[in-house]
Amino acid sequence: MKILKIQTLRGPNYWSIQRHQLVVVRLDLEDFQLQRTSFYQNLCKVLPSLAGKDIAQRSDISNATFLAEIVKDIAIALQGYIGMKVDFGTVKPTVENNIYQVVFEYQTEQAGRYAARAAVRICTSILETGTYATNELQEDLKDLRDIRLDGQLGPSTESIVAEAKARNIPWIELGSRAMIQLGYGVHQNRIQATLSNKTGILAVELACDKDGTKQILRDSGVPVPRGTTIRSPKYLEDAIAEVGGFPIVIKPLNGNHGRGITIDVRTVKEALVAFDMAQEVSEEVIIERFHLGRDHRILVINGKFVAVAERVPANVTGDGVSSISQLIEITNKDPRRGDGHDNVLTRIEIDRTSMDILARQGFTLESVPPKGLVCYLKATANLSTGGVSVDRTDEIHPENIWLAERVARIIGLDIAGIDMVTEDISKPVRQVDGAIVEVNAAPGFRMHTAPSIGKPRNVAAPVIEMLFPPDAPTRIPIVAITGTNGKTTTTRLIAHIFKQTGKRVGFTTTDGIYIGECLVEKGDTTGPHSAQVILRDPTVEVAVLETARGGLLRSGMGFDGSDVGVVMNVQADHLGIGDIDTIDDLARLKSVVVRTTLPTGYAVLNAEDPLVVAMAKEVESKVAYFSMNPDSPLIKSHIADGGLAAVYEEGYLTILKGDWKMRIEEAVNVPVTLGGRAAFNIQNSLAASLAAFSQHVTIEQIRQGLATFVASSEQTPGRMNLFELGKFHALVDYAHNPAGFKAIADFIQKWEGEAIGVIGAPGDRRDEDIIELGQLAANMFGQIFIKEDKDLRGRAPRVVADLLRQGVQEINPNIPCITILDEAEAISAALDSAPQSSLVVVFPDKVDAAIAIIEARKSKLS
């Protein structure tokens, strides 16, 4: 078997609305020999966790489906072995023999992709040899763990993201530095670990300057250790005398995670060693008085005390039998311990500091300490070096709370970790000769959310409440538009209408990403990346997002839901691409847009398309319908129940809600309808008006938007762009499927002169679809020029042109039909041949180039 393609989805998708993170594998099972029972027995020897999922006896599935299911189960199991909680998966046969789509959940994208490849390797090996080498499986699991560590969010970030998700606040991971955006557009905030966009850079700089922090706190009357800073060991003895003599603490001026710190230094010899260790981290070294006591981390968020944890340095307790080395090994087997931030605790690693600390206690790694004796292994109590935490939130004295809150305000940190050394946190720090020894920006949350002893504290909630106070918005209005035809025009029209409200609108279309009036990126930008460009922009107040089939298939939706989901229609286009082989498959794919519409929002549906109407049964939002037929039974029933609709009634675009009716504008006064002749643009205008109205845009603002939106190369490039060229006209439209051709045919019928067509077709369409375009063209035009796209999409030259010609000749073998493969030459030839009062209709591949040719011709007339 072999993998043909691996895709990773990152949002609501064809396979699942709730499970956003999915791997989709297109798998060719090829020829295989299979004895199910023995294969399954061998598989369970390699992966015992699959033993309870005995599908070998299922008679309702073929051997091929069985193997595809096994690959899925292996991929899920591999991730489970390394602690990733994934359980969703499914398989689907394609129309091609023995080719399947295998779908399963992931937590870390690269781990999911690795699991897919490993699952195929394991399955193939068991098919061919009956086993899979243990060392290879262990290597796979090691690689997966490494990938997971590299790709997962840290525990502090994860806790904040989890709290945001619990409050239905959307989030986006920005770049590769664990920066997270919470909220969309103009309402966003950002965090990086426990730094936020509200964290002042001066406060962070001050907190990183340990000596400067201590000086400011001392000057403010805060109890801090006496200390000084030196750069050379020749000043060491003077510095020790200055702080009051031994015992002392030696630490780097700019350090973190306990690196380079030595505590309870009692001799000059020890001090020299400690100085060298500190200078490996920072050129400047702090010498300060050592306060005897326990290490406590007090967390202050937005000026308020949140939690306190006692931190205990990494240690082992003697059992009278085992060596310290063995005790460390036993301790590291605790399932709560992992590498780095992989788990709630970190494995203890022995380094030079550990050896020195053991030596000061009279031990080596081979020593066997007496039963019950605690042997410390680190100088500091950081969890990242193997320490443990004990929650003391309910024990701290009110005066210590007041002091910690004051310290956070003095330094200026919105999120501060304040280290207090005291024998008893329940007593005022001044009474027990304690001190504030450090103030930390970006404090870790793990010691509070998952203490080794005591009650876990939800310290992420105050962060979210600081960033988003009560009633503060986290989302901007999102309108998502999908369908086979009319998406781009409707998207642009909705965006234009929203601009009448005075808000900054970001929108994506098949011709580019726009914010306000500015083009951000040119191209076919209707996928999830383009949507996130808009949602990440801190100036955008409304997002209008064209959401096309291709992006949904490749990556899923780029956002978790919309306020309005619009489905224009579902027509037979792109069938056979991406294993979407039937129109029902296509409808299911496009329904993702409305199945994710928020319960408070609206699904705006085409009442004239049965496939679209059927989507109403699957949505959680309210439903609104649009129709060219004011007498539609569905519309009448819907508004009788108090529903919202838009219809074309007596020449007017009209909004209906229950017994209420409001005429927006007469269609002939809406420029995009070309005087009411472009029926499909009347329909597009209904959908746009309804979407805007559902979001409280006023009728007057909608009317103003409709009146100022023109089917031009500036506002709707490639969509019903009509040019006057002296004695004749030219029309440029990006119609590229049967439904699009039929819509243009309806417009042509109202044209008094002859119609000439310049036609082409995308090469990735089925032969029968291309032939149908030729057949339709034969009924539309009196003369036809056939051209080909520059990108043939896998076809040989002339194949598409010949299929189009075949379709034309099947309907009318006598129609003048000229093949000119180059698009520019074909357009020029058609323009040259145009008689008086005729209409040259161009269906371009390259819209801008086609418009440029016509504009150049027009400029010569003036």
Language-model features and meaning:
Residues 1-166, 304-307, 312-326, 353, ...:
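ATP-dependent carboxylate activation and anion-phosphoryl transfer catalytic cores
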Residues 3-63, 492, 579, 678, ...:
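ATP-dependent carboxylate-amine ligase
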Residues 99, 103-238, 242, 256:
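Conserved N-proximal alpha/beta basic substrate-recognition cap immediately N-terminal to
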Residues 164, 419, 508, 546, ...:
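Residue-level signal for inorganic ion chemistry
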Residues 186-352, 398:
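Active-site nucleotide/adenylate-binding loops and adjacent lid/helix of ATP-dependent enzymes
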Residues 194, 469-512:
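Walker A (P-loop) phosphate-binding motif
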Residues 515, 519-626, 630-634, 669-671, ...:
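Flexible active-site lid/hinge loop adjacent to a nucleotide/diphosphate
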Residues 580-587, 591, 601, 621-742:
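Adenine nucleotide phosphate-binding catalytic loops in nucleotide-utilizing enzymes
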